[in-house]
Amino acid sequence: MKTKFDRLGTGKRSRPSPNNIDFNDQSATFKRNKKNSRQPSFKVGLSYNSLLDDCDDENETEEIFEGRGLQFFDKDDNFSITADDTQVTSKLFDHDLEQTPDEEAKKPKKVTIRKSAKKCLSTTILPDSFRGVFKFTEFNKMQSEAFPSIYESNENCIISSPTGSGKTVLFELAILRLIKETNSDTNNTKIIYIAPTKSLCYEMYKNWFPSFVNLSVGMLTSDTSFLETEKAKKCNIIITTPEKWDLLTRRWSDYSRLFELVKLVLVDEIHTIKEKRGASLEVILTRMNTMCQNIRFVALSATVPNIEDLALWLKTNNELPANILSFDESYRQVQLTKFVYGYSFNCKNDFQKDAIYNSKLIEIIEKHADNRPVLIFCPTRASTISTAKFLLNNHIFSKSKKRCNHNPSDKILNECMQQGIAFHHAGISLEDRTAVEKEFLAGSINILCSTSTLAVGVNLPAYLVIIKGTKSWNSSEIQEYSDLDVLQMIGRAGRPQFETHGCAVIMTDSKMKQTYENLIHGTDVLESSLHLNLIEHLAAETSLETVYSIETAVNWLRNTFFYVRFGKNPAAYQEVNRYVSFHSVEDSQINQFCQYLLDTLVKVKIIDISNGEYKSTAYGNAMTRHYISFESMKQFINAKKFLSLQGILNLLATSEEFSVMRVRHNEKKLFKEINLSPLLKYPFLTEKKQSQIIDRVSQKVSLLIQYELGGLEFPSYEGASKLHQTLVQDKFLVFRHCFRLLKCMVDTFIEKSDGTSLKNTLFLLRSLNGHCWENTPMVLRQLKTIGLVSVRRLIRHGITNLEEMGHLSDTQIEYYLNLKIGNGIKIKNDISLLPCLNIRTKLENCKIENEELWLTFKVEISATFKSSIWHGQHLSLDIETEKSSGELIDFRRLQVNKLQSPRGFRISAKISPKLEKIEFSIHCQEIAGLGKTIVYSTDHLASQFSAKTPNIRKDLNSLEKCLFYESSSDGEVGKTSRVSHKDGLEESLSSDDSILDYLNERKKSSKAVESAAVIHPEAHSSSHFSNGRQVRSNGNYECFHSCKDKTQCRHLCCKEGIPVKYIKEKGPSSIKPVSKPDQIRQPLLAKNINTTPHLEKRLNSKPKQWQEENTDIATVHTLPSKIYNLSQQMSSMEAGEQVLKSGPENCPEIIPIDLESSDSYSSNTAASSISDPNGDLDFLGSDIEFE
């Protein structure tokens, strides 16, 4: 796909356009006849409210200049464009550089329109099919004046308009414009709406879903399930957040078709780009603008003085800046008066400051409320309660005339509501919150104290909005509200559907008074925050192969808003200057900063350098794919190997993603009670086995996870019930992050070949999916209608896992759980939907290399299932193979719906001759407790080859057990006739196999072997023995085998030759060559044994006590922790094969699959098995869909 990267680094070049207009040219001034020449002109200034900022507009100033699209102006209108009105400076940067005409032509065009007394446009100007989108018949003043730029133009546009002016309609006009351009063919059209918060996204979804009948509307946020995500990606209008869209666009190669269909991007609250999380918004807009062709951006912003910088950043396809439409406060439907009060504090305690703010509230309410509804935003939940109590005790309002119809469960809330005062925060129950909102809407509540939960969403009739303090808890510390939060709170004052006038008051520290005055008056300069976490986004762009050198990194940055602002105000980016030379020029500073970040990524192995280019490693791909912070990823990479389950849990709990949480003071006792629970798997105890003080976020996260997985009961001490809702919300936040963190850890441990850590990570991931520890009876809670009480009843009847539950009839289930007749079948049907998993392994080949064994296993898996979806989740299987030492051999993932027929693959493993075990496991990732494990020990090699060598040392597992035979009792060489295998194959031996007799005879007598260890060529130089054979360099004679490559074949005589003593006086004609099929069936010889002395030394080592043959074939672990001996189950199978039956019901035998043998072996065990070209099961790593 052709992208705009062809134009990267060409910002100084412009394309001449005949339509470009020099705003400084007085000839560009158009004047109409004026009825009143004294009428003041207004400048379209940028003013923004985050609540209503839903619209994306594009302004075509050329049409205005040429008189097109201005049907709503007439000769009586006072309309003019002057050089002064444009407010465009003569320089793009603050450097004293002379501009060329081309550079001036690329300055953003800012339209300034004088007020018009002309009536507003009617919706009849639109086609009949479009009018149904709007619930009104006439556009307001702002919408009418923006109509030509939005509906009659296709250029990028930046719009500024005050809160309550109806900007949502402008977004809808932009959508209708696209529909018009595509002739209503929307099958191949995508529209993206991006808002900074989920609340705004949900609000827009509710508005647009019923409005656009012919367009499908979907929403993508962190709360969207997998099935909803797949459905939303197919919609015409996708409503999403910056972080979610960033996550999706990081998988550009996976969804390239989707992104090619995007034609319109609507950006709400673009001024949030100045906040730390605004870097994601800046990155995705840059990515879309550079990689998509013919895409239109319509963005809304609050009032900022440097809106032209946004226009310079969001350039059009012809490299021209975006158009600017800016409207002042006169366009607001409800006039809003704003005040900022600063207070000086002698105390440093924020709780004491909150009490001082309370004392000032009475004066403010009496001055500004006018006996109308008041909404007070408080920084904390405790502050909402204390504020409500303070106002109640001071009788700020007389008792409400209307009586409350609700009696909330919270006693304090109920007491306050009877006096017309209430509080609202996320810690109270949903029923109480709903009751408070209804009573406030009904007028029964005069004063409502709330946290920021009411800043968006429900429209409340608040005449006066008071922001009581501008600091709130964030990341375990007090921080200033974001600009978005403040603007959203102010936007709640005087809503159009309730008031004609409103008032907003900000109470803050005297030091911050000027800051908030600049914010509400639009004089706060907008800066970029991309540099604060640029390292993570550079890693993502490297993974996308957008950045592969320092030059491409700098070119990519040239397309960002950060580059525009750094050129004008480098002093605002001290983090950049910290790593660059003091007197460096602008581009050199950017170059040095990028070089430092890339070197850091190389150091921590997130990227590496290959052939002079930066390439993303497996760690970098995992970090990008799962949207992990740099600090968390570095922690995963540097983690110790072979972590236990507790170690994995601790590693997860210390991730950077949880730093936004905090341990509240009133929660410490709650978590202490949880920590002392005997059901807790890993409590935090001191050396004296007493509970530690729970004051760290990592402790809280760990306890929340264990609380859920262990099915613990909520503490019952006095006052604990008030914290139940808080615990539920914190638990939801923790679980939302856990899944992508664990999936990233899976990828990390695969790359590190750390089988133990991977196994425990997958165990924890399955437990989180099932909301229970996998090796406990709590797995039964995954079934519908099964709760803690039902689990206890089942345990009393000996039912502890899903398999045992599957054996019960519906009648038994009803009896055990005390259910009504007919309810047991529902649970039985739920169990029957669980897949039945099968796995079988067989040892195919064994050979020796460098004193180690190379084993090749054939693995066959299959599944019997009615549906590949269970409880709304697509099921997937994890197949892991690891050594008992903890080293990972192989890991694969496969969707259950891909197992319509059995699948097979081969795994090669290199193990030591000690009693090392290999563990094969298969588990369903989305269901805890559904999986099987096979443990294959080197002991089983003896039974595999017992027909050849009954007397074999089981701890050696070397060449002899595969090849040598026992001598006769009289000391003579035993017969080496054909030996039948269990699988029906025969071993063909030629006359030259007499070498085996020789070696066995030497093995009996150490002295005889030592005397014959060295054979001189002179001793048998007689042609009498050669009989046509050639003499080898070691003195032995060549054999007559017809092997193609005697250095690689299985015959010792081919590799070592035949000693003269054992050459039979037979001609070549009497020797029967070994057929090729026989060669394949023979065990492989060690490639590194090249001399007879070396071989004899190994054969004549002092024999150990021979052990009896072990009849057990494999050990199978069935969750939870049950061990079965399969020797009886597998009596009909050949030695070395294992069958795994999984699920609640018995499954039929699998028909074996014929897999072609492979003779290729790799020196890297994990690499060769994971990338096995002969396997028909692709390695998917941790390819997990985003939440």
Curated annotation (Swiss-Prot):
Chief place of localization: nucleus
Start and end residues of each Helicase ATP-binding domain: 148-322
Compartments where found: Nucleus
Ranges annotated as C4-type zinc finger: 1039-1054
Motif (DEIH box): 268-271
Annotated ranges, domain SEC63: 616-922
Location of region: Disordered: 1-41, 1146-1187
GO molecular function, one term: zinc ion binding
Pfam families named in the record: DEAD (PF00270), Helicase_C (PF00271), Sec63 (PF02889), SNRNP200_wHTH (PF23445)
Reported cofactor(s): a divalent metal cation; Zn(2+)
DNA-binding in keyword set: yes
E.C. code: 5.6.2.4
Occurrences of domain Helicase C-terminal (ranges): 360-542
Entry GO CC: nucleus
UniProtKB keywords: ATP-binding, DNA-binding, Helicase, Hydrolase, Isomerase, Meiosis, Metal-binding, Nucleotide-binding, Nucleus, Sporulation, Zinc, Zinc-finger
Disruption phenotype: No phenotype during vegetative growth, transition of double strand breaks to later recombination intermediates is partially blocked, crossovers are reduced and distributed randomly, with a high incidence of homolog non-disjunction at meiosis I. About 10% of wild-type level of meiotic divisions at 30 degrees Celsius, at 23 degrees Celsius delayed appearance of meiotic divisions, which eventually reaches the wild-type levels. Decreased spore viability.
CDD domains: DEXHc_HFM1 (cd18023), SF2_C_Ski2 (cd18795)
Catalytic activity: Couples ATP hydrolysis with the unwinding of duplex DNA by translocating in the 3'-5' direction; ATP + H2O = ADP + phosphate + H(+)
PROSITE patterns assigned: HELICASE_ATP_BIND_1, HELICASE_CTER
Subunit note: Oligomerizes.
PANTHER family the record matches: HELICASE FOR MEIOSIS 1, HFM1, ATP DEPENDENT DNA HELICASE HOMOLOG
Family, as annotated: Belongs to the helicase family. SKI2 subfamily.
Protein name per UniProt: ATP-dependent DNA helicase MER3
Organism: Saccharomyces cerevisiae (strain ATCC 204508 / S288c)
Gene (UniProt): HFM1
